[in-house]
């Protein structure tokens, strides 16, 4: 073997130049630098699909009933490499769908099933998702058969819905239309825990107070979807666990009744697996050897018998008939006293005291053997917590009410991050409009847009007032769960009309002028707000001697208070907006990091973020008329002055005690401008400076205007799913 033989496993003969690991990335050496990667994580360079592939068009050609039927057949087609419990994969597929959707959190709209992210790290290797890679492999023949028209994101959720239908539940419906991503979602903050399954103490300020958990986190431990099934920090205490159940479900927009229904319905079927001690189980999919092919948690003791399979460590089923939708869960929960025991794997669980043989659970492999049913600490919380108990007692007395409540809650759980019904496809979509879908009526399109623009221009409103109002209306959009945006004009409703970031006095003035104009023209106020912003920008473009029109698409509707779940919008209140150079308070997170987060939710690239900030500054659109970052003496003119100043070495930048900066002339020492770090980052960050230099060039004044208009229009239309349908 010579020195160039790459089979020499004792060391690589050359230092390979590709950065295929994490230890040599710039993030390692400069961890505090602004990392723009979250703006470019799912672009065309990552996707294997053709550039012109449009999933909305592809899904329309899908054989919807055929997919449903094939998944239904798969439920009872047990495979030797992962046999079905009782010959039925229903419980496994339901857990797959539940855990795909259950990572959603209301605070920032991230997580959830809408992208098929369960296929990637970290979710695919969380301990709470153990064995779900087996479920995905079982579904692969279906995905393979239907190809591009069927996304993994849709299939992962459909599987559980079909399973419930197969086992006797009248489901509420199902919508296709989710679009796959092709890599991990690096924008999501899953927590700063020191390790997977670190104590809850690491994400709360007081373990006794579940609500002290850091926002927007919505799980009690890193690596879990909701709460520890054994109890808070692994200590059984149903009363304390109830507090964490209530908090985690509330943070994914579920009320107490929906939470109880999901807990009951989720454990009416299927079983937990604790066939061996956790330390005997192999690595997760991300950490297992290459020959395992992503098949994680290898269990040397698994012999094809359900009793030797290992997933959570708990062992057993919750009901006597785990493949049938019925009221057995509540029957057993209320019929018996329960005591804490341990599974074979050493996990805490609850089992009934003196159970009758007819209530025992048949073995998942050998029906002649019977076992005790089990409950988790979260299940016992349904009995111990007085609010949950009252709800569950009603469910117990009225199984039909339970079934309907659960079916609706399941639909909400699995569709919460899809946005409005304009994103729904297929014959199983329910006709009923639900308030959590943020419904918006269809808006008018036949009015005279040019005439309305003329009236707006004559209204006496300043360009800055109109631009700021349009921006505030649109900036609430979150690509994470397709909520917010200018459509619906909810900026005029509670709670948005009173948000400090929306400058209520200025907002009321602008709305007071625009609403009569909209009514007279037969236009929606939602359209009129955006159109007014466009008018303001076109005024600024003309002042700069340019002639670039701002595109406008009519058709936005106006939502009403009755269509708006005000409480669910409260979490969307911005406490900072780097685009308008505003922060309600000084936070531990820097203004530029908050701006980056907003840009990611809006679906912007780094260049789009830069061009919008530079443009909005010179347009005078800052919150409260602040002068920070307004690097121009031509306010209201759409120029490249911001970028010319930030790249000009005639100035030096001096930090002040209040966290802001002065821009001083190097020769005279005079203060010329003031700024925040959300301004200075465009000169300090190497990537953003490279972009700023492009727009500061003498030959790119027109390009800047065109790019600003394109980015502005992208934000204004971010929620116009009707234009894509």
From Swiss-Prot:
Bifunctional enzyme with both catalase and broad-spectrum peroxidase activity. There is a cross-link at residues 98-226 (Tryptophyl-tyrosyl-methioninium (Trp-Tyr) (with M-252)). It comes from the Bacteria. Binds 1 heme b (iron(II)-protoporphyrin IX) group per dimer. Formation of the three residue Trp-Tyr-Met cross-link is important for the catalase, but not the peroxidase activity of the enzyme. It catalyses: H2O2 + AH2 = A + 2 H2O; 2 H2O2 = O2 + 2 H2O. GO terms for biological process: cellular response to hydrogen peroxide; hydrogen peroxide catabolic process. GO terms for molecular function: catalase activity; heme binding; metal ion binding. It holds the Pfam family peroxidase. One of its GO terms (cellular component) is cytosol. It comes from Dinoroseobacter shibae (strain DSM 16493 / NCIMB 14021 / DFL 12). The record marks 95 as: Transition state stabilizer. This is Catalase-peroxidase. The gene is katG. Homodimer or homotetramer. Belongs to the peroxidase family. Peroxidase/catalase subfamily. Its EC number is 1.11.1.21. It is an enzyme of class 1 (oxidoreductase). There is a cross-link at residues 226-252 (Tryptophyl-tyrosyl-methioninium (Tyr-Met) (with W-98)). The active site is at residue 99. InterPro entries: Catalase_peroxidase (IPR000763), Haem_peroxidase (IPR002016), Haem_peroxidase_sf (IPR010255), Peroxidases_AS (IPR019794). Disulfide bonds: none annotated. Heme b binds at residue 267. Keywords: Heme, Hydrogen peroxide, Iron, Metal-binding, Oxidoreductase, Peroxidase, Plasmid. Its cofactor is heme b.
């Amino acid at each position: 073997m010579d020195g160039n033989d790459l089979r020499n496993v004792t060391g690589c003969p050359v230092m390979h130049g590709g950065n295929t690991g994490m230890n040599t990335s710039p993030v390692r050496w400069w961890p505090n630098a602004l990392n723009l990667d979250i703006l470019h994580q799912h672009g065309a360079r990552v996707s294997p699909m053709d550039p012109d592939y449009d999933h909305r068009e592809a899904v329309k050609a899908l054989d919807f009933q055929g997919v449903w039927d094939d998944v239904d057949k798969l439920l009872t087609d047990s495979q030797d490499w992962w046999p079905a419990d009782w010959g039925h994969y229903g419980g496994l597929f339901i857990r797959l769908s539940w855990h795909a959707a259950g990572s959603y959190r209301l605070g920032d709209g991230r997580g959830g099933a809408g992208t098929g992210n369960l296929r990637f790290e970290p979710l695919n290797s969380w301990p709470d998702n153990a064995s779900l890679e087996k479920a995905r492999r079982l579904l692969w023949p279906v995905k393979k058969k239907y190809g591009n028209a069927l996304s993994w994101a849709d299939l992962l959720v459909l599987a559980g819905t079909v399973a419930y239908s197969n086992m006797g539940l009248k489901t509420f419906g199902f919508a296709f239309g989710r679009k796959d991503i092709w890599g991990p979602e690096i924008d999501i903050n899953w927590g700063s825990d020191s390790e997977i399954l670190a104590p809850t103490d690491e994400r709360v300020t007081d373990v006794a107070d579940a609500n002290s958990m850091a926002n927007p986190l919505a799980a009690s431990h890193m690596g879990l979807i909701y709460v520890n099934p054994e109890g808070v920090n692994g200590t059984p205490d149903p009363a304390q666990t109830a507090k964490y159940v209530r908090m985690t479900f509330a943070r994914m927009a579920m009320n107490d009744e929906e939470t109880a229904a999901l807990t009951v319905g989720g454990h009416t079927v299927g079983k937990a697996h604790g066939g061996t001690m956790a330390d005997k189980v192999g690595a997760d999919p991300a950490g297992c050897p290459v020959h395992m092919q992503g098949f994680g948690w290898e269990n040397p003791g698994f012999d094809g018998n359900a009793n030797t399979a290992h997933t959570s460590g708990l062992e057993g089923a919750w009901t006597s008939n785990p493949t049938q939708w019925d009221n057995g869960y509540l029957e057993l929960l209320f019929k018996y006293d329960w005591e804490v025991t341990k599974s074979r794997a050493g996990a805490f669980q609850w089992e009934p005291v003196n159970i009758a043989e007819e209530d025992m659970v048949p073995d998942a492999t050998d029906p002649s053997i019977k076992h005790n049913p089990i409950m988790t600490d979260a299940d016992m919380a349904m009995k111990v917590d007085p609010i949950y108990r009252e709800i569950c007692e009603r469910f117990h007395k009225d199984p039909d009410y339970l079934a309907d409540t659960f079916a609706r809650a399941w639909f909400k759980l699995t569709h919460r991050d899809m946005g409005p019904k304009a994103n729904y496809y297929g014959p199983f979509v329910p006709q009923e409009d639900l308030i959590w879908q943020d419904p918006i009526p269809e808006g008018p399109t036949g009015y005279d847009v040019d005439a309305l623009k003329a009236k707006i221009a004559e209204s006496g409103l300043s360009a800055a007032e109109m631009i700021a109002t349009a921006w505030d209306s649109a900036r609430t959009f979150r690509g994470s769960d397709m909520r917010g945006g200018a459509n619906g004009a909810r900026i005029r409703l509670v709670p948005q009309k009173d948000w400090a970031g929306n400058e209520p006095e200025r907002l009321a003035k602008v709305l007071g002028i625009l609403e009569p104009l909209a009514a007279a023209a037969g236009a929606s106020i939602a359209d009129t707000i955006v159109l007014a912003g466009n008018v303001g920008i076109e005024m600024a473009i003309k002042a700069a001697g340019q002639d670039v029109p701002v595109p406008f698409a009519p058709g936005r509707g106006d939502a009403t208070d009755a269509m708006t779940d005000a409480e669910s919008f409260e979490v969307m209140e911005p406490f900072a907006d780097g685009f308008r150079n505003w922060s309600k308070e000084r936070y531990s997170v820097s203004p530029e990091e908050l701006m980056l987060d907003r840009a990611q939710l809006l679906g912007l690239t780094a260049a789009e973020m830069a061009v919008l900030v530079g443009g909005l500054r010179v347009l005078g659109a800052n919150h409260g008329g602040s002068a920070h970052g307004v690097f121009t003496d031509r306010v209201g003119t759409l120029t490249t002055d911001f970028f010319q100043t930030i790249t000009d070495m005639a100035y030096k930048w001096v930090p002040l005690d209040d966290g802001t900066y002065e821009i001083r002339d190097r020769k005279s020492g005079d203060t010329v401008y003031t700024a925040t770090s959300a301004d200075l980052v465009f000169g300090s960050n190497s990537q953003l400076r490279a972009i700023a230099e492009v727009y500061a060039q003498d030959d790119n004044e027109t390009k800047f205007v065109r790019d600003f208009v394109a980015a502005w229009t992208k934000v204004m239309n971010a929620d116009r799913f009707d234009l894509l349908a």
